């Protein structure tokens, strides 16, 4: 009897030790990424990110697409070449490019002249993106809308996506469309919220887009983002990680790391794994939310461990 009890206790100990390892095999940790403006790109900064455990970046394009201080093509080429060299030297992958957005460069514009000009600008940016060799190119579906024009805007978005997607494919990248903030339809007397404001609207839009155009989900833009992850499934190819209240552009560090925000990160991670998501855990938080890059790494490790513990 004593031998049987001893064997049972040994077996129990083995199972207890092995379970966390098995759990981590089933749910391998994601790489960690961070959004960064191109003006902040230099080797020293990127090396500090890499040393802190950050493997990937998303580059925002506002730094070289500016109507106030436009750069020449030669200046942009030189800037992006230096950027790519710095990333490669630091061992950082350029995962994604966040394309420019704004009222006058809205690819859903019903004014066909503005839409065509917007597409032309995006085409030019994509040509420059060849230098950076990203895996993902992220687009906003729209700027703010006028009242009662959502169906027309969706049709214009679909038209623009069909024009831009072949260019994205030339780069060997995937095109993704981001969900937008919009807990209420109406913003003010002049405007409605952008396209992609609810789970239902994102589903409606994605059904009309080519199958090789994918979804990006901003966890700060919607209440219960796990429901949108669930709806997108394997069509989800990139994320923006931040916490918030689903009503404002908060861009907090995830709660509990910040003590702010309503997101349930255990549910979010659960749905990411169910969707087969293998891209990076790409932060898009305010720089005031962390003191050093290691805070981003430590926050993810905290969230990941909480998720693993929830599966025991």
Protein language model features and the residues they cover:
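Short, flexible/disordered intra-domain loops and linkers
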Residues: 65-74, 185-195, 253-255
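Active-site acidic/histidine proton-transfer and metal-coordination neighborhood
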Residues: 88-90, 105-214
